[in-house]
């Protein structure tokens, strides 16, 4: 997994409901835990762009509902600052469901994907229609 090269603000915490931007059958998911997070003294785990989380599917097809799956954050409302000085924010917080090898389970992604995510996860970048 490649490093991002920028410091992304961790704006999504556990318990947050996110939209699922792929065609796996999940529509709304809730963050349960953050992959690789080691906290300090009861600190709430947070995640940002291109981070992996374990999520619970709240709305979707009957075979996907109430399942725990892994997901990668591809959009976040909180603005990020690129080294060029550009500030980028999206309209919503969105994830893509991935498998254990961090490859997407769906076959298409709806909406734009941040360039930082496409660099870290090339398979997600190749499926995206718009990379911002």
Curated annotation (Swiss-Prot):
SMART domains: Ribosomal_L14. SUPFAM superfamilies: Ribosomal protein L14. One of its GO terms (cellular component) is cytosolic large ribosomal subunit. Transmembrane segments: none annotated. GO terms for biological process: translation. It holds the Pfam family Ribosomal_L14. It comes from the Archaea. Keywords: Ribonucleoprotein, Ribosomal protein, RNA-binding, rRNA-binding. GO terms for molecular function: large ribosomal subunit rRNA binding; structural constituent of ribosome. Gene3D superfamilies: Ribosomal protein L14. NCBIfam families: PRK08571.1, uL14_arch. Binds to 23S rRNA. Forms part of two intersubunit bridges in the 70S ribosome. PANTHER family: 50S/60S RIBOSOMAL PROTEIN L14/L23 (PTHR11761), LARGE RIBOSOMAL SUBUNIT PROTEIN UL14 (PTHR11761:SF8). Part of the 50S ribosomal subunit. Forms a cluster with proteins L3 and L24e, part of which may contact the 16S rRNA in 2 intersubunit bridges. Belongs to the universal ribosomal protein uL14 family. This is Large ribosomal subunit protein uL14. It comes from Methanospirillum hungatei JF-1 (strain ATCC 27890 / DSM 864 / NBRC 100397 / JF-1).
